């Protein structure tokens, strides 16, 4: 017996669009929406991070603590500074997942940039690239420091969550920045060597850790020169 049930209406514009769509087009999902309530469940670096331009290169310092909702210490040995280029390093500030994703994405883009152009990326171009990704990507409130060395000299940049890029001789980001800035500005001198800058940075991180619940448990130092990036972790007592 013939089925007389009417089939779907194929005459409307919506139906036409469905049948005319490219069968080979990728199916693009939506970016996940994150709320303030969700952020309470996210591992965050809390953090105090410092970048100092020196006569030798750049020194970057961070504490080691990660927290949940700013109240519970979830990890006491987080490396919050990573090599992003053979002569540049970037700190992790904000949600751990967002910062790690940001670094992976930026590394890939730097490799692509250099492969296409056949030359090393400049720190100015790298900072611009980082700012563009911070503004346009789903990296959830990151605020890193970029420090690097190129043919034009030694450079330190702070990158805000909206993609703003600011260059300075030294900078601080993270939850302990107000305390760290006080110590850093008191001890900073122009044309410091990397060794001198390490001591100043360590003292500034320790001062922040005394008052900021999101910072503490030791320090990672990145020594950035034209020869490369060297990153090591220390207890405060080893440096001060």
Curated annotation (Swiss-Prot):
Propeptide span(s): 1-46
GO molecular function, one term: threonine-type endopeptidase activity
Region annotated Disordered, chain positions: 1-48
InterPro entries (UniProt xref): Ntn_hydrolases_N (IPR029055), Pept_T1A_Psome_bsu_arc (IPR019983), Pept_T1A_subB (IPR000243), Proteasome_sua/b (IPR001353), Proteasome_suB-type (IPR023333)
Activity regulation info: The formation of the proteasomal ATPase PAN-20S proteasome complex, via the docking of the C-termini of PAN into the intersubunit pockets in the alpha-rings, triggers opening of the gate for substrate entry. Interconversion between the open-gate and close-gate conformations leads to a dynamic regulation of the 20S proteasome proteolysis activity.
Enzymatic reactions: Cleavage of peptide bonds with very broad specificity
Gene Ontology CC terms, in alphabetical order: cytoplasm; proteasome core complex, beta-subunit complex
Pfam families attached to this UniProt entry: Proteasome
Catalytic residues, chain numbering: 47
Locations listed in the record: Cytoplasm
Keyword ATP-binding (UniProt): no
GO biological process: proteasomal protein catabolic process
Enzyme class: hydrolase
Keyword annotations: Autocatalytic cleavage, Cytoplasm, Hydrolase, Protease, Proteasome, Threonine protease, Zymogen
Signal peptide region: none
Top-rank taxon, per record: Archaea
UniProt function note: Component of the proteasome core, a large protease complex with broad specificity involved in protein degradation.
Assembly notes: The 20S proteasome core is composed of 14 alpha and 14 beta subunits that assemble into four stacked heptameric rings, resulting in a barrel-shaped structure. The two inner rings, each composed of seven catalytic beta subunits, are sandwiched by two outer rings, each composed of seven alpha subunits. The catalytic chamber with the active sites is on the inside of the barrel. Has a gated structure, the ends of the cylinder being occluded by the N-termini of the alpha-subunits. Is capped at one or both ends by the proteasome regulatory ATPase, PAN.
Protein name: Proteasome subunit beta 1
Origin species: Haloarcula marismortui (strain ATCC 43049 / DSM 3752 / JCM 8966 / VKM B-1809) (Halobacterium marismortui)
